[in-house]
Amino acid sequence: MADTDSPVTLRTRKFIRNPLLSRKQMVVDILHPGRPNISKDELREKLATMYKAQKDQVSVFGLRTQYGGGKTTGFALIYDSPEALKKFEPRYRLVRAGLAAKVEKASRQQRKQRKNRLKTLRGTAKVKGAKAKKEK
């Protein structure tokens, strides 16, 4: 079986400081021989300690494991503040990291039915017309 306590080596390359987006950008190489992939949450913690930042300032994505395992490569962004992270990161990545709530919307079928109901009535009195149509 794989040992989950074995050491993991993190290497960063292509390090760029991006002052316009107030972040540091890098490619991360994770060496984990004889061990399963490291979780994104654990990776965020390790990068935060390496770069003296808070865990909620780090965003990790695009992790790909090489064939045969043992080495994973991905991207990491370390923002100067949690506010900058919330401002510039895509919403889906914030949801994945648990920094934003997922917006629950109606099912596709319900949205289409509502759209078609509203299409049958035109003008400003859509709500009144919908009620009148139901009463008939």
From Swiss-Prot:
List the SUPFAM superfamilies: Ribosomal proteins S24e, L23 and L15e (SSF54189)
Indicate yes or no for the key word Transferase. Answer: yes
**Could you give a single Gene Ontology term from the biological process aspect?**
translation
The protein's UniProt keywords, in alphabetical order, are: Cytoplasm, Methyltransferase, Ribonucleoprotein, Ribosomal protein, Transferase
InterPro entries assigned: eRP_eS24_sf (IPR053709), Ribosomal_eS24 (IPR001976), Ribosomal_eS24_CS (IPR018098), Ribosomal_uL23/eL15/eS24_sf (IPR012678)
Q: Where is this region: Disordered?
A: 105-136
Q: What is its main location?
A: cytoplasm
Query: Which Gene Ontology terms of cellular component type are present?
Result: cytoplasm; ribonucleoprotein complex; ribosome
Superkingdom of origin organism: Eukaryota
Q: Give me the stretches of Basic residues compositional bias.
A: 108-120
Protein family (similarity comment): Belongs to the eukaryotic ribosomal protein eS24 family.
PANTHER family per the UniProt record, alphabetical = 40S RIBOSOMAL PROTEIN S24 (PTHR10496)
| Subunit note | Component of the small ribosomal subunit. Mature ribosomes consist of a small (40S) and a large (60S) subunit.
> Mind telling me what this protein is named?
Small ribosomal subunit protein eS24
